[in-house]
């Protein structure tokens, strides 16, 4: 008998036993950040996987290289001997593939429900919170990997260390982001959970009620078994408010003295942050995280809390943090190009909520104190722009120069008073910065950039839409005309 490989062991270990009747899994919108990772993991487990997307992309090309058939465009003819259809909340119920599946009695499940099935028979670790999920999930995954625990992981961004956002590991561990945007994280049944923070976002899901949002986070913690573990940010007021209702073993982390896991003696130098972590019954541990910003120290503390509980050594934690190469579009340095007697440094970041944008601005100021900060910001969703309008005005006024793109709709219809022109007017009236409206479609971006940028600027492209592609083009000097 030939010896089994780690891949063979992983397939036997993680394949869901109760899904034995399922052979062919089809993903509608397979190129989405939350979909492609699950699709790839299922393919690696031995299922037949196919799917469709509205357009070709690097992600769909990657999936096809892995042997996953991807159709461009949605049509009922794509469904060939499919056993289950996986959709995200972004998919219209009138989608022809969804309608065909319903007509043919093919089960239609949400992506989080499928992720929940992957987690059901494993030691699942779910990372929830309004901000910081992707980086925290990536840090924890890296710590487990450094201890040779070989976890399966599903992340909302590309882990720079591996170049992918999901992988099938040979161990019982699975680490995944838990998405509160549509309350679908309630499908998960993890053994350990992290809550990084709780803020008002995706309020349409919760009927505009912040209390309902907080109630749902409590319900998420109740998905843990009574012997599970919740690791939550004790510095976050909203998390502290709901903690008494958890009813599960809980550890808090943060900078404040009343936390179980604390960071002290913080020193920030360039693109690195140094701190000492204090934990109960442990010696103080001096660490360096290869990321700037206090928010990334908090992300590291969350990962340390779970990693320590799972048996990861201090040495592995230290190696993981110091060697952490980041996540795609999370304060990602895209490069530099020469300008005059200096250069312009390009950084790209996915943050799209006012608190995320503010954390990125602080990290940029701390890591590059001698550079002028020029931000190219693309608001994401009209509803978020409406709900967080005043906060956006305040935060975006903190940069030295602001280039403002139109709102990326993400499938939403325009909302009166929630567009970039109105946002620019309010920022201008505040008087701290003079915003410049930019429309890349009109082809005026190169000329505007030429006029705005100065030697030794830091240009930060910010947002969850397609603004990141501009940073890539700039790094390749396709948009900057000398």
From Swiss-Prot:
Keywords of the record: ATP-binding, Cell cycle, Cell division, Cell shape, Cell wall biogenesis/degradation, Cytoplasm, Ligase, Nucleotide-binding, Peptidoglycan synthesis
Pfam family membership, one: Mur_ligase_M
Enzyme Commission number(s): 6.3.2.8
GO MF entries: ATP binding; UDP-N-acetylmuramate-L-alanine ligase activity
Positions that bind ATP: 129-135
Pathway: Cell wall biogenesis; peptidoglycan biosynthesis
GO biological process: cell division; cell wall organization; peptidoglycan biosynthetic process; regulation of cell shape
Catalyzed reactions per annotation: UDP-N-acetyl-alpha-D-muramate + L-alanine + ATP = UDP-N-acetyl-alpha-D-muramoyl-L-alanine + ADP + phosphate + H(+)
Domain of life: Bacteria
Signal peptide, first to last residue: none
GO cellular component: cytoplasm
Compartment annotation: Cytoplasm
Role, per record: Cell wall formation.
Family according to the record: Belongs to the MurCDEF family.
Family matches, as PANTHER family: UDP-N-ACETYLMURAMATE--L-ALANINE LIGASE, UDP-N-ACETYLMURAMATE--L-ALANINE LIGASE-RELATED
Protein name, per record: UDP-N-acetylmuramate--L-alanine ligase
Species whose genome carries this gene: Acinetobacter baylyi (strain ATCC 33305 / BD413 / ADP1)
């Amino acid at each position: 008998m030939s010896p089994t490989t780690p891949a063979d062991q992983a397939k036997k270990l993680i394949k869901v036993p109760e899904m034995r009747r399922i052979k062919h899994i089809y993903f509608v919108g397979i190129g989405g950040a939350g979909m492609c990772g699950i699709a790839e993991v299922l393919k690696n487990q031995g299922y037949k996987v196919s799917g469709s997307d509205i357009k070709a992309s690097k992600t769909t090309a990657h999936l096809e290289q892995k042997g996953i058939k991807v159709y461009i465009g949605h049509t009922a003819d794509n469904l060939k001997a499919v056993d289950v259809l996986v959709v995200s909340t972004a998919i219209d119920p009138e989608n022809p593939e969804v309608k065909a599946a319903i007509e043919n009695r093919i089960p239609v499940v949400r992506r989080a429900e499928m992720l929940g099935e992957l987690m059901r028979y494993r030691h699942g670790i779910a990372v929830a919170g309004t901000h910081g999920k992707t980086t925290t999930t990536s840090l924890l995954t890296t710590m487990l990997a450094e201890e040779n625990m070989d976890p399966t992981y599903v992340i909302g961004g590309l882990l720079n260390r591996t170049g992918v956002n999901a992988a099938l590991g040979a161990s019982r561990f699975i680490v995944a982001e838990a998405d509160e945007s549509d309350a679908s994280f309630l499908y998960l049944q993890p053994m350990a959970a992290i809550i990084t923070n709780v803020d008002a976002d995706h309020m349409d899901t919760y009927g505009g009620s912040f209390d309902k949002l907080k109630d749902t986070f409590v319900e998420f913690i109740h998905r843990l078994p009574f012997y599970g573990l919740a690791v939550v940010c004790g510095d976050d007021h909203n998390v502290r408010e709901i903690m008494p209702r958890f009813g599960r073993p809980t550890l808090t982390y943060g900078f404040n003295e009343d936390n179980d896991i604390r960071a002290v003696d913080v020193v920030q130098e360039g693109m690195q942050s140094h701190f000492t972590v204090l934990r109960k019954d442990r010696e103080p541990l001096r660490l360096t995280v290869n990321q700037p910003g206090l928010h990334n120290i908090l992300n590291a503390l969350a990962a340390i809390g779970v990693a320590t509980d799972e048996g990861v050594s201090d040495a592995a934690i230290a190696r993981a943090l110091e060697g952490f190469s980041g996540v795609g579009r999370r304060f990602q340095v895209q490069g530099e190009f020469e300008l005059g007697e200096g250069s312009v440094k390009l950084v790209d970041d996915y943050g799209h909520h006012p608190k995320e944008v503010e954390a990125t601005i602080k990290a940029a100021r701390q890591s590059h104190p001698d550079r002028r900060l020029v931000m190219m910001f693309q608001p994401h969703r009209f509803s978020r722009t409406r709900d967080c309008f005043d906060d956006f005005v305040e935060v975006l006024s903190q940069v030295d120069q602001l280039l403002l793109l139109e709102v990326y709709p993400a499938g939403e219809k325009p909302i009166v008073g929630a567009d970039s022109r109105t946002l620019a007017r309010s920022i201008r009236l505040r008087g701290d910065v003079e915003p410049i409206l930019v429309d890349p479609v009109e082809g005026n971006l190169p000329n505007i950039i030429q006029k705005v940028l100065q030697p030794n600027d830091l240009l930060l492209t910010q947002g969850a839409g397609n603004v990141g592609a501009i940073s890539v083009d700039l790094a390749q000097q396709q948009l900057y005309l000398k």
